């Protein structure tokens, strides 16, 4: 029987963080690094828990080099060859602790990932990424990967509800990717009518994961540093960004010049562009669930990184969190009808 859940679900745009008394004198006092010990792999990781999405325009080796200099993480896209990985491991061994090998849930994906992890044993993270993490097939795939790689930390998703977070953690995943349809180049919600407002999804999924000593990634929906702060405030352990890291020198693709403006291509991994590039086209039984856009060229990603980290430190000082770990404990969200003054855009 159809039913309606009448409880209000909110997105980042529906709330602001309430400022609170603070003993911090400066943003420079805020510690953004976190240390995690993962439930199933038993591995420990330290770093700033912001992840570049495993999309083939942004999840590049070039991006990983810059991110690792800030102790930030990159989920490298799944379309690099074994030789590409070997070359990267030889030239940038210092980056390998801050990257994940990405994989779909097919047999070919598993074989390819296995070859890479065998050739580059320093990589300890696996990102299992499918659009719909609710399928029985995916749960079984997570169990299989856990049995093959007992000491690797597994990220798996995407889902948006507590019961599926619990299922995937109990099946062997350590970190669950949360988000269905919030991405800047995702059209799942308009094509399928399926989705969940990201802020509420993060709050509910974090509660379920933390009860089992698991972790979550808020994946998608961030448009500015304030949204990243809200995701952490809602209980996300990691925040994954795609659109905010698009358009940079380190992104894949050439710079396009049009009408005197420099642009770079950015597209969703279920878009026509991605499926034509990697699967020879959109299969008859599928619909494209992603956009292809030309974004303004932003130069080196370094400035964007500093902007995001600076915003996050400032959030922590406003709410009295000396460490990023404390942000969710200090966060009180207020519902609003407007985010900011739009007189000048």
Swiss-Prot record:
Metal-binding is among the record's keywords: yes
Reactions this protein catalyses: IMP + NH4(+) + NADP(+) = GMP + NADPH + 2 H(+)
UniProt-listed Pfam families: IMPDH
InterPro entries, A to Z: Aldolase_TIM, GMP_reductase, GMPR, IMP_DH/GMP_Rdtase_CS, IMP_DH_GMPRt
Active site: 186, 188
Sequence positions that bind NADP(+): 26-27, 78, 129-131, 180-181, 269, 285-286, 314-317
Protein residues bound to GMP: 219-221, 242-243, 268-270, 286-290
Residues the record lists as Phosphoserine modifications: 28
Single GO cellular component term: GMP reductase complex
EC number: 1.7.1.7
Any one Gene Ontology BP term: IMP salvage
Keywords: Metal-binding, NADP, Oxidoreductase, Phosphoprotein, Potassium, Purine metabolism
Chain positions recorded as K(+) binding sites: 181, 183, 186, 189
CDD domains: IMPDH (cd00381)
Subunit structure: Homotetramer.
Similarity-based family: Belongs to the IMPDH/GMPR family. GuaC type 1 subfamily.
NCBIfam families membership: GMP_reduct_1, PRK05096.1
Function: Catalyzes the irreversible NADPH-dependent deamination of GMP to IMP. It functions in the conversion of nucleobase, nucleoside and nucleotide derivatives of G to A nucleotides, and in maintaining the intracellular balance of A and G nucleotides.
Protein name: GMP reductase 1
Species assigned in the record: Mus musculus (Mouse)
């Amino acid at each position: 029987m159809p039913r309606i859940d009448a409880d209000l679900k909110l997105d980042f745009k529906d709330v602001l963080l309430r400022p609170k008394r603070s003993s911090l004198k400066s943003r420079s006092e805020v510690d953004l690094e976190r240390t995690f010990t993962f439930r199933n792999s038993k591995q420990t990781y330290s770093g700033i828990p912001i992840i570049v999405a495993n999309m083939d325009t942004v999840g590049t080796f070039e991006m990983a080099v810059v991110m690792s200099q800030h102790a930030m993480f990159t989920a490298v896209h799944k379309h690099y060859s074994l030789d590409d990985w070997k070359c990267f491991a030889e030239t940038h061994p210092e980056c390998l602790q801050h990257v994940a090998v990405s994989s779909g849930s097919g047999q070919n994906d598993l074989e390819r990932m296995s070859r890479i992890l065998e050739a580059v044993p320093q990589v300890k993270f696996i990102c299992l990424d499918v659009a719909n993490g609710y399928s029985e097939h995916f749960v079984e795939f997570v169990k299989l990967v856990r049995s093959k790689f007992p000491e690797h930390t597994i990220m798996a998703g995407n889902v948006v509800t507590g019961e599926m977070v619990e299922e995937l953690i109990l099946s062997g995943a350590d970190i669950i990717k949360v988000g269905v349809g919030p991405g800047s180049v995702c059209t799942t919600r308009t094509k399928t009518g399926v989705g969940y407002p990201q802020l509420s999804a993060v709050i509910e999924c974090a509660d379920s994961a933390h009860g089992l000593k698991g972790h979550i990634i808020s994946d998608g929906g961030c448009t500015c540093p304030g949204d990243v702060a809200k995701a952490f405030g809602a209980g996300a352990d990691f925040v994954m960004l795609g659109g905010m890291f698009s358009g940079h020198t380190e992104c894949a693709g050439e710079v396009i010049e049009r009408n005197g403006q420099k642009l770079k291509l950015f597209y969703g991994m279920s878009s026509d562009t991605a499926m034509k590039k990697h699967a020879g086209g959109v299969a008859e039984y599928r619909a494209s669930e992603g956009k292809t856009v030309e974004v303004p060229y932003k130069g080196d990603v370094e400035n964007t990184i500093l902007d995001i980290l600076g915003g996050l430190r400032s959030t922590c000082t406003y709410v009295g969190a000396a460490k990023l770990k404390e942000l969710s404990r200090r966060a009180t969200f207020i519902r609003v009808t407007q985010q900011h003054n739009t007189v000048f855009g």
